């Protein structure tokens, strides 16, 4: 098994060497309009879409395999009275192939105001570009087309050395005597460019997430007890080192991350663990169109409520099963190409080996993204 895995990695490196700067899947799925693309006085019809076909073949006791075929659509009317103010109103639609009804059909409203060249605020539906800079261990990328779009309040800062953002996403709102809890997520992420020259750059990323379920004005569901407050936290810090190689392979990256988990409300915690940690070591190579990476994941009692299920110490498919120690080796290949300025296509394949059990899981997907503006009127 190990020999075949190494041979597959070498084959992917050979393929990718012949192939714009490669992006991560999180960057590829960015739909929200960048500030530098906003033009004052334009009233546009904007159409955002992401067609996806993702197949996850998972073995083991933690998560069952499944397939996600479908498309995400966001038709919008946008207006920018000035370069600093950008408004969107429209709809967020998700349809899975083989279903007659839309999986999600939600109204969309977003407003962004840029206080300065570096600092801006977003209200309503949030800017989820690059998934806030979160790694998949903390935030499952496919939530982009399975969950409701985030909505709340967000502040973003972009500088020459520091990029940071903080946000609160309100996922379930409650009124007096509602028989369910309010849900929201608070996040703070950033990366600091500690060193950079023509040959080497070093960034120091930090991520903090809090997930809360509670409320003071809700009541117990009919025939049941009032649920306790649940607050869970995840933390992450590390380094990302990129070496510019040139030639066919553009950069080689060496990354390391530490992750933490804490059940803040330990007295009412319903999960099997109240504290845990993990670390991730990753090396990758980037070519003009592709990225290949190999990583090692080691975790102890690690839980991330929004993270990719495969990495956790608790089972999603069997609520009674948990395993404190996890060790996973993974190899991933991601290819993407810009068709036009507003359209991109991508493909990825991933393999995961659970070291204790020897289970081999894999995932692959194909994606087509289109973000297009149609000018209706210039004021």
Q: Over which residues does each language-model region extend?
A:
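Transmembrane beta-strand segments of Gram-negative outer membrane beta-barrel proteins
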Residues: 33-56, 87, 121
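Surface-exposed coil loops of outer-membrane beta-barrel proteins
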Residues: 120-191
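Surface-exposed loop and membrane-interface regions of Gram-negative outer-membrane beta-barrel proteins
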Residues: 81, 85-116, 136-137, 307, ...
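Outer-membrane beta-barrel biogenesis signature
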Residues: 22-44, 127, 377-379
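Surface-exposed strand-loop-strand hairpins of Gram-negative outer-membrane beta-barrel proteins
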Residues: 50-72, 89-97
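Exposed, low-structure sequence patches enriched in small/polar residues
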Residues: 70, 108, 159-167, 179, ...
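Surface-exposed extracellular loop regions of Gram-negative outer-membrane beta-barrel proteins
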Residues: 68-91, 156-167, 254-255
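Bacterial Sec-dependent N-terminal signal peptides
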Residues: 1-28, 155, 362-379
């Amino acid at each position: 098994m190990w020999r075949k895995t190494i041979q597959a990695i070498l084959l992917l490196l050979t393929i990718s060497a012949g192939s714009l700067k490669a992006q991560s899947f999180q960057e590829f799925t960015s739909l929200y309009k960048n500030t530098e693309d906003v033009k004052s006085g334009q009233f546009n019809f904007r159409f955002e879409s992401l067609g996806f076909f993702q197949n996850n073949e998972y073995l083991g006791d933690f998560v069952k395999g499944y397939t996600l075929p479908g498309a995400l659509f966001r038709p919008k009317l946008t207006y920018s009275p000035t370069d600093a103010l950008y408004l969107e109103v429209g709809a967020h639609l998700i349809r899975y192939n083989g279903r007659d009804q839309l999986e999600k059909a939600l109204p969309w409203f977003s407003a962004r105001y840029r206080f300065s060249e570096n600092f801006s605020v977003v209200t309503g539906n949030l800017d989820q570009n690059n998934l806030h800079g979160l790694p998949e261990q903390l935030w499952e990328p496919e939530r982009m087309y399975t969950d409701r779009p985030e909505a709340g309040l967000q502040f973003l800062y972009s500088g020459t050395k520091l990029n940071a953002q903080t946000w609160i996403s309100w996922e379930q709102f409650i009124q007096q005597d509602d028989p369910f809890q309010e849900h929201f997520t608070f996040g703070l992420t950033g990366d600091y460019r500690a060193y950079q020259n023509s040959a080497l750059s070093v960034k120091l990323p930090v991520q903090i997430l809090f997930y809360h379920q509670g409320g003071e004005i809700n009541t117990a569901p009919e025939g049941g007890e009032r649920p306790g407050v649940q607050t869970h936290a995840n933390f992450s810090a590390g380094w990302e080192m990129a070496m510019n190689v040139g030639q066919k392979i553009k950069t080689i990256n060496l990354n390391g991350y530490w992750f933490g988990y804490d059940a803040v409300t330990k007295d009412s915690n319903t999960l099997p663990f109240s504290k845990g940690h993990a670390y991730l070591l990753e090396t990758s190579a980037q070519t003009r169109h592709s990225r290949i990476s190999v990583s090692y994941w080691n975790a102890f009692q690690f839980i991330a409520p929004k993270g990719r299920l495969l990495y956790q110490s608790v089972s999603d498919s069997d609520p009674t099963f948990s395993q404190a120690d996890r060790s996973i080796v993974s190899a991933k290949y991601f290819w993407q190409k810009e068709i036009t300025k507003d359209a991109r296509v991508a493909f990825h394949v991933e393999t995961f080996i659970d070291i204790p059990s020897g289970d081999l899981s894999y995932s692959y997907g194909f994606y087509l993204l289109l973000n297009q503006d149609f000018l209706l009127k210039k004021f």
